[in-house]
Each structure stands twice: as structure tokens, then as C-alpha cells.
């Protein structure tokens, strides 16, 4: 089976395991069976807001207006195709495999614009992209609360110049204010 890995770094011949700075995972290399899921990782960022419906369908839900275009629009990447191996383990994330070992690249596909590539995958029915305008009130409230918890759990109020803190403060001001209020209340 072919597995995908996407990176903003072109020209790789071997994919190396690494530690991601914000997710608390061990040194590993992540791959997936799904092209659109891999495309989400063509950027290095703090959040990848995709998920799966109960029917197992992949979706991406914007968490603020214009999120998809801001994060992916005009950004290039390389989609790497690799062969599945016995040392690749499934994770709790559907369609994801991880390994602690380097993996040779079978093929590299340049992706000149990740947003255009994701929209093409949506057109093909491989992913549903949900714009902010279609996010219902219950999900909007969940987003505010989830980001509030993230701010508190990572103690970002104490480190306001941390890149993640600056991003969350700018994109989720209501969550930032609620976290500050919660921390300051007796």
C-alpha cells in the first residue's frame, strides 16, 4: 500500500522521524493512507483542525473566518509517496501510521498551492471543507472552550511572546480573555 507524507521541505529522498514541538508525541514519522489528510500537514503550524464524521468521512472545519485560506493559500509543499512497511504502527488517528525509523521516498509530487490542492480533493469527494460561515453555534462555543483550555494547559498566559501564545491571542481573543479571567479569579 502507498502511504503519504507532506512537508514544506522539497527534495527529500528519505523521510526522517522528528519530534513535533507542540503535540507531546515521541520522535516519529507520521504517514497516512489519505492524500487530503497528508496535505493538511504541508505546513508547520500549531493546529490541524481536521476530523472524521461518525461515518468515517474526513473533514476540515475552520475555527475562525478565513482560516483555510490564511494557513494554506499560496503555500507550496511536497507530497511524498512511500511504501507501507511492517514497522509502521496504526495510531488512534484513523488512517495514520507511525514509525521511529527513516523511510525512503518512492515519489515526490510538488504541490504549488496547498489550498488549491485541498479544494481539488474536496471536488473529488475525498474531504469536506467547512467554512466558518457554516460552523454552527454549538461548534463555535466548543472552539472557544477548547482554545481556552489549551491556553491554560500550556500556561501561555505566562509566556505571551511564545509564538503559539501570540497566535492564539490574535485568533481566539474570546478564549484568551476567558482564560485570563479564569486564572485571575480566586
Regions found by a protein language model. Give the residues of each.
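ADP-ribose/NAD+-binding catalytic cleft of ART/PARP-like enzymes
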Residues: 1-29, 41-44
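Short, flexible beta-strand-to-coil junctions
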Residues: 5-12, 33, 81-86
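Conserved NAD+-utilizing ADP-ribose enzyme module
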Residues: 41-186
